[in-house]
């Protein structure tokens, strides 16, 4: 995986994570086959997750975020946590030519849409460890929903790296919107 692999030591160093014996045992085996890792080596990032919410990541690395504003009060930022497991998340994205529903319908049985906390965890780790941006200004839709402001339904959460503000920011993308989007994609394990 080369530069697209992060290990336990990277997570310990950059997040202050303590895995303990059970955590190390859980992460001892990478659940993806060698063939999958070879096929994904230029398009995905492999990393171990550690149980943190976006608000907890913000507390550890505030300079990397644009101000959270009201997002800190939404459940996607406050309650959702990264799982203690291996992740293989796509770092290259398909062109934004289809709607969320159209792209979601095309996911293979081995793919899923990750949560915003998982995307943020990966983006922060990539920046702190290698000074590499993952999203480069794109709005990447995640699996989380948040209550819309002007729209009565739930909206998809998007994550982006705001290059002007040098930080990670969030927003709402209405389910009523039919414009093309960039969908975050992860391999299931």
Predicted features by range, described:
Residues 1-112, 118-189:
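A binding-site-centric feature that preferentially detects glycan-recognition modules on secreted/surface proteins
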């Amino acid at each position: 995986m080369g530069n697209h692999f992060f290990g336990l030591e990277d997570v310990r160093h950059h997040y202050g994570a303590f895995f303990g014996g059970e955590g190390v045992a859980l992460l001892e085996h990478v659940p993806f086959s060698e063939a999958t890792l070879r096929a994904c080596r230029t398009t995905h990032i492999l990393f171990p997750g550690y149980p943190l919410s976006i608000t907890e990541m913000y507390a550890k690395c505030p300079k990397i975020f644009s101000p959270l504003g009201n997002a800190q009060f939404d459940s996607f930022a406050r309650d959702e946590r990264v799982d203690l497991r291996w992740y293989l998340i796509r770092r290259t994205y398909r062109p934004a030519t289809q709607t969320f529903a159209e792209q979601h319908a095309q996911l293979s049985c081995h793919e899923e849409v990750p949560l915003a906390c998982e995307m943020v965890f990966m983006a922060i780790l990539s920046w702190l460890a290698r000074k590499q941006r993952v999203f480069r200004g794109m709005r990447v839709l995640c699996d989380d929903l948040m209550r819309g402001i002007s729209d009565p339904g739930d909206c998809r959460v998007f994550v982006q790296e705001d290059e002007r503000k040098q930080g990670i920011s969030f927003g709402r993308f209405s389910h009523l919107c039919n414009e093309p989007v960039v969908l975050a994609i992860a391999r299931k394990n």
